[in-house]
UniProtKB/Swiss-Prot annotation:
Gene name linked to the record: nuoC
Region feature (Disordered): 1-21
Entry annotated with the keyword Hydrolase: no
Main localization (coarse): membrane
One example GO MF annotation: NADH:ubiquinone reductase (non-electrogenic) activity
UniProt keyword annotations, A-Z: Cell inner membrane, Cell membrane, Membrane, Multifunctional enzyme, NAD, Quinone, Translocase, Transport, Ubiquinone
Stated family: In the N-terminal section; belongs to the complex I 30 kDa subunit family.
NADH dehydrogenase I subunit C: annotated segments: 1-189
Protein name as annotated: NADH-quinone oxidoreductase subunit C/D
Length: 599
């Protein structure tokens, strides 16, 4: 993480930059020539480079083999460019596909973009270079109709197999009322049921061998150990898992499409529901990305308040994860203890925000209101209460010999495998890599806090992942202690024209600010045309928002990258060859909710 200099970290995150000075731009030009690329200036904070489709695979291979390589395909998706008006200096395109890569050794990213015309919509698959490209490419085809040549199984992933059309195209309806009334006839019902029938041959699976007949078993989508509406089709030889196919999409709500019809301000409540246990943690990357577009620098008090709420929700989520993991292994009591502890967190959150699970409390340029009187006492009581409770969880359950025997060494993978599948969060850190965005790429003032990043001993297994989460809660309490003792004075909103809603006191004195308030609340603020990006360390891994503004009151394109999506894609590579009982332990150790997967 030494490649990012102090000077670079100190630069305002909302500066529009083309990153021509980034070493990777020079490396690419030395290899492919100075005229091979179009470098786009954005507020994403990373180099954005348009490349020719014919050179895409060669360039990706080059990045993968650099001395300090780009080893993770972090994200991949598309955009309908046909209605975008602010495209000066960019290659002509009806559609585009972007590829976001991370170099761990450099602590730097690069985003490649490919321009496509409507009558020639195809890109080559990256699955032979990055295996986690599989699901991302399926979703890109499904949402935009962009063909992926060479993909091993290009089929729908979020929508039913019988669905027609590509929902993220600009000419596709955004509201249910724009569709014709739906009528479920007997013929349609039979068709839907047939589409859910699993055909092993479609996935390259054999029904039998010369000596064995395989059994195919549906685990889910309503099995309690599936942790939501999630289905895994298992190919079994007795109790051994020969192969499996995760089936997602049952919780898909079109969160990215919603971003195109909500104002920048009114989309905030939707962010809470992306990962419904994370609360304010979900709001953080969105409001930071919007603030980059607007050029807003929030007061220090706002930064610390946001950190405080985020860490409260981090502990809240981890408590549920650890207790349900213990329940999956076979012990019931810790779940009930955990809900008692989580209630104490909700008491603090409700006193501050007025809500519990989904506060929708962060604002563009600040927070909804200042901290209430007495918040210090509530937080103090919680911080005094929790340490002994964590010790009890550890001693009575997590260090139990039965649990250790069921979890230690189960569903194990190393750092190279984690990076190849886009794994982040505790799953990656358990392999020994301390990649935590709060430390490596500080946001919202995290660089001012003293805390450690727990890591594992080189192999990420079910037991090491859960023990890391336990230590992460202790580190979150260290951060909360510092928030309590060092809360800065000052305003809870930035003094900026695009702060939404604007400061109320001004609307009572000036007609101009009253008009601004009315327009921003009714129509929403108008953001400058640009692109911005923000990643954060969420409760389950790295979460990010990649926003495209076309100079309107609404986002032109809202891309939500969640950690749980690649974590579930990784399942077959980890669990094949293990027992069904090991799969239950593995699922419990991942820490996911299906809203985070399906969006």
């Amino acid at each position: 993480m030494t490649d990012l200099t102090a000077q670079e970290l100190a630069q305002p995150s909302w500066q529009t930059r083309d990153h021509q000075d980034d070493p990777v731009i020079g490396e690419l030009r030395n290899r492919f020539g100075p005229d091979a690329f179009t470098v786009q200036a954005t507020r994403t904070g990373v180099p954005v480079v348009w490349v020719k489709r014919e050179q895409l695979l060669e360039i990706v291979e080059f990045l993968r083999k650099l001395p300090k390589p780009y080893v993770m395909l972090y994200d991949l998706h598309g955009m309908d460019e046909r209605l975008r008006t602010h495209r000066a200096g960019l290659p002509a395109a009806d559609f585009s596909v972007f590829y976001h890569f991370i170099s761990i050794e450099r602590n730097r990213d690069i985003m490649l973009k490919v321009a496509l015309s409507e009558n020639d919509l195809h890109v080559p698959t990256l699955t032979k270079i990055f295996p986690n490209a599989n699901w991302y490419e399926r979703e890109t085809w499904e949402m935009f109709g962009i063909d992926v040549v060479g993909h091993p199984h290009l089929t729908r992933i979020m929508m039913p197999q019988t669905w027609e059309g590509h929902p993220l195209r600009k000419d596709y309806p955004a509201r249910a009322t724009e569709f014709d009334p739906f009528e479920l006839t007997k013929q349609k019902e039979d068709l839907e049921m047939e589409s859910l029938t699993f055909k092993p041959e479609d996935w390259g699976m054999k029904r039998s061998t010369a000596n064995e007949d395989f059994m195919f078993l549906n685990l889910g989508p309503n099995h309690p150990s599936a942790h939501g509406a999630f289905r895994i089709i298992l190919q079994l030889d007795g109790e051994e898992i020969v192969d499996c196919v995760p089936d997602i999409g049952y919780h898909h709500r079109g969160a990215e499409k919603m971003g195109e019809r909500q104002s920048w301000h009114s989309y905030i409540p939707y962010t809470d529901r992306i990962e419904y246990l994370g609360g304010c943690v979900n709001e953080m990357p969105y409001v930071l990305a919007v603030e980059k577009l607007a050029g807003i620098k929030v007061p220090e008090r706002v930064e610390v308040i946001r950190v405080m709420l985020s860490e409260l929700f981090r502990i809240n989520s981890h408590l549920l994860y650890i207790s349900t993991f213990i329940q999956d292994v076979g012990a019931m009591s810790p779940v009930f203890f955990a809900f008692t502890d989580r209630q104490k967190i909700y008491d603090v959150v409700e006193a501050i925000t007025g809500f519990r699970m989904h506060p929708a409390w962060f604002r563009i340029g600040g927070v909804a209101h200042d901290l209430p009187k007495g918040w210090e006492r509530l937080l103090r009581e919680f911080l005094d209460w929790m340490p002994k409770r964590l010790k009890a969880y550890e001693q009575t359950a997590l260090k139990n010999s039965v649990l250790i025997g069921r979890a230690k060494g189960v569903s194990a993978y190393n750092m190279e495998e984690a990076l190849a599948w886009g794994t982040t969060g505790a799953g990656l850190r358990a392999t020994g890599l301390d990649f935590d965005v709060r430390k490596w790429r500080p946001y919202s003032g995290y660089e001012n806090f003293d805390f450690e990043i727990p890591i594992g001993d080189g192999v990420s297994c079910a037991y090491s992942r859960v023990m890391l989460k336990m230590e992460e809660m202790r580190q979150s309490m260290r951060i909360l202690e510092q928030c309590l003792n060092n809360m800065p004075a000052g305003p809870f909103k930035a003094d900026h024209p695009l702060t939404t809603p604007p400061p109320k006191e001004r609307t009572l004195q000036h007609i101009e600010t009253l008009i601004t308030h009315f327009l921003q609340v009714s129509w929403g603020p108008v953001m400058p045309a640009n692109e911005s990006f923000q990643m954060i360390e969420a409760t389950k891994g790295i979460n990010s928002y990649y926003l495209t503004s076309d100079g309107s009151t609404m986002s032109y394109r809202t891309r939500v990258r969640t950690p749980s999506f690649p974590h579930l894609q990784q399942i077959p590579s980890v669990i094949n060859g293990s027992l069904v009982s090991d799969l239950i332990v593995y699922l419990g150790s991942i820490d996911f909710v299906m809203s985070d997967v399906d969006r």
